[in-house]
Amino acid sequence: MSRAPDTHSDFIPRHIGPSDEDQATMLAAIGAASLDALIDEVVPPRIRSRAPLALPAARSETDVLQDLKRMAARNQIYRNYIGQGYYGTHTPNVVLRNVLENPAWYTAYTPYQPEISQGRLEALLNYQTMVADLTGLDISNASLLDEGTAAAEAMTLARRGSRSSSPVFFVSQHCHPQTLEVVRTRAEGLGIELVIGDESRGLPECFGVLLQYPHSLGGVADYRELAQAAHAQGAVVACVTDLLALALIEPPGQWGADIAVGSAQRFGVPFGFGGPHAGFMSCRDAYKRNMPGRLVGVSKDAQGNPALRLALQTREQHIRREKATSNICTAQVLLAVMAGLYAVWHGPRGVRRIAERVQSLTGALRAALAGLGVKVANDTWFDTLLLETGVATPAILAAADCARINLRQVDGARLAVSLDETVTLADLQALVNVFAAGLGKDEVALPAPQASLDGIPAAVRRQGPILSHPVFSSVQSETDMLRYLRKLADKDLALDRTMIPLGSCTMKLNATAEMIPITWPEFALIHPFAPASQTPGYRELIDGLSAQLCEITGYDGISLQPNSGAQGEYAGLLAIRAYHQANGQPQRNVCLIPASAHGTNPASAQLAGMDVVVVASDANGNVDLADLRARIAQVGERLAALMITYPSTHGVFEEAVTEICDAVHEAGGQVYLDGANMNAMVGVAQPGKFGSDVSHLNLHKTFCIPHGGGGPGVGPVAVRAHLAPYLPGVLDAQGRLDPEAKVGPVSAAPYGSAGILPIPYVYIALMGAEGLRRATEVAILNANYIAARLRDHYPVLYAGRNGRVAHECILDVRPLKETSGISAEDIAKRLMDYGFHAPTMSFPVAGTLMVEPTESEGLAELERFIEAMIAIRAEIAQIESGERDRDDNVLRNAPHTAQMLLAEEWHHDYPRQQAAYPVASLRENKYWPPVARVDNAYGDRNLVCACLPVEAYA
């Protein structure tokens, strides 16, 4: 019997792990009278919010999804020929169902622990191999945020690698408009002089060149001589390119490019109104140590078997800080995995066949339009035609609108059309009919497409094979693909298997109801530069989510454009810099940053053109107020901002936060409060109301966008009213910035990774004000419960007043190194034998473990983790007492693979049973790490960042 839809929310107790009874048990165990009393003990009274958030009450999953379906239906799905870096594509259903919609893939964390990440590392290595192969360059990274930011990163890489002393970077006018705008924003912050022009007229003296290959408006140029001329003056040559086109045109590496960047979007990832999509970068070997982003490399494990891991990590912001190659932290791993698997699914013949078909259909369209008297401006092409439509332009656009077709309007007299793999002959005939109607002519039949490469000059046609590694020819059927994906997923630990207690990462539940809408066509199939009249549903979503986030944070304005937390930091600092400049204080360019801050903070400040001055921490892990005042006095009128993480990276609410904000404001500076730890404040404190001027939020932490193995993320930047005019500029439908905008864009799409904004929207709607506050309270309860239960076994390094922590705690394992020889890394690897992902290692304090359980983990899982940590402490005690060998023990040899434990001979100073099943529950449900401990140093000394030959795994 059917029943009426229930509008009451039962989601809150499904999102929050501990039941009411369990919460009561935990509160009693830590000596707190109630959740409210615990929050009073943890959160400073001066910042504690007592009034409930002005948000609607929690709603049911059915109600929220129906409402979102109504919102999505307001968007209009047109046939898109806009191109401009975004193209229609068919996501292979086997990838859609088994990767994008599979929590084994989307709930994983960045693969910093390689032994439990071999599946997604292999998928990323496929992606890197694909990019390096198609671009003809030596090495590729594991993804960047989008094409525009990849181009900006190419500019900074060129500056680091150039022999020229020139401050000029030349950018071709043939680049996509949005790329020009993002590069311009980056150049202004770094003091780089940008020259935009037509490269065919010669190059100025410059340190680097950025070309588009093929051109944004269709042409395919031969850049060999230009590259030689650039190299002759010491300049580095970068190009923005298209992976599908590279199946047919000469790889950039062969004609002289040093760096290639672009978007892998058209390899199986939908528009999503602009993202998320994986940007790519490849380069010559000489630039590898300066290349931004993560890099998957091949190494070996302790048994001598091939093993994958993240290579050359000393380049990254979490180690190099303001000297890092980039501020990038989160990238676009899930989307890079999908793009790499698209190549595996289609194989070299399939990818080339798709490219040939697109090029052939473009040629047929060109012939049909010529028959109508339309002048095609470009003599060369892959998928794009530039059409001189003159006074007929408005009529053609009107006819296109009637046919629900989007064309790219270049200006008042020119249109452009880009084809993709989804275009059918019927689509093409409808497109030709639109032009006939707009021109007032009779319809003409589309000529039969010809299997030729007439649009590509012979000099730049690709001669060699593509995707030559056997992995791209290994899949012959969907059965093969399904089993390959299962094999990869089984190698990894994600939230679908176990708690991931990573401090500063907030690995909470990514509920199925939150994920469902992202693949709805009304959200997934919208081009980022579609006319505003076609996207009212997205506008409602963006405006609604923006208002909710402003209410939650206490800020007045927000931009959802930044597509990572690091980009949000960058955008916030650009706003501060522009604000000071508008006030006639351009000298304010010093950013104060506590020594304990996450590495993205100083890296972002450097990108925004600021000098970094470090502020010391006191013995309790708080900002040293005396040192802060001394640094403020030291920099004087140069003070631009203070960046502070709150609660602190040490896992405590600093009591003096309002005093810190006041000191900065009195000196004329602005306060940037890093919102990475917002999961400890939602509903209990609002940074915009206790002294902060700007924050970024990590929607992939606090608001349930999954980490995806290292991306996607969304990092909105929220500001008080006086900074609102300086939020990132929003591009128009042509990808251009309003001349009145005070700050440029930080992402290529107007609203960043808009395609995943339904996730936080659904989360907030399902939780309501009360549920959001309760989630914060339970996150704090869970952290304090773990701290209390483990305090007798491992010292908790920092605590606030009343001995409480915030939403995470730092376990100090440093003394164990002296008493037993056991390090934080050894404990992390041993936890894998217990079926756990390790806590955060050595941040913010070297040699420690930082644990963040989140509100989504129930008491049973917390107890399982506590049991494992106590058992490991007992194993360490055996070493301390001399019962077990100091060098040959279960921790130093961890993790243990099945292959190790099934070896014919066993010579270790402990039994196999202890290695495999240290607690009884593992006999029922055991995760086996696929490789033993990975040798990181070997991998960096012998750098290989592409797929190994098959025989290497024999």
Swiss-Prot record:
Pfam families: GcvP2_C, GDC-P. The keyword Translocase does not apply. It catalyses: N(6)-[(R)-lipoyl]-L-lysyl-[glycine-cleavage complex H protein] + glycine + H(+) = N(6)-[(R)-S(8)-aminomethyldihydrolipoyl]-L-lysyl-[glycine-cleavage complex H protein] + CO2. Its cofactor is pyridoxal 5'-phosphate. Belongs to the GcvP family. The glycine cleavage system catalyzes the degradation of glycine. The P protein binds the alpha-amino group of glycine through its pyridoxal phosphate cofactor; CO(2) is released and the remaining methylamine moiety is then transferred to the lipoamide cofactor of the H protein. This is Glycine dehydrogenase (decarboxylating). It comes from Bordetella bronchiseptica (strain ATCC BAA-588 / NCTC 13252 / RB50). The lineage of its organism: Bacteria, Pseudomonadati, Pseudomonadota, Betaproteobacteria, Burkholderiales. The gene is gcvP.
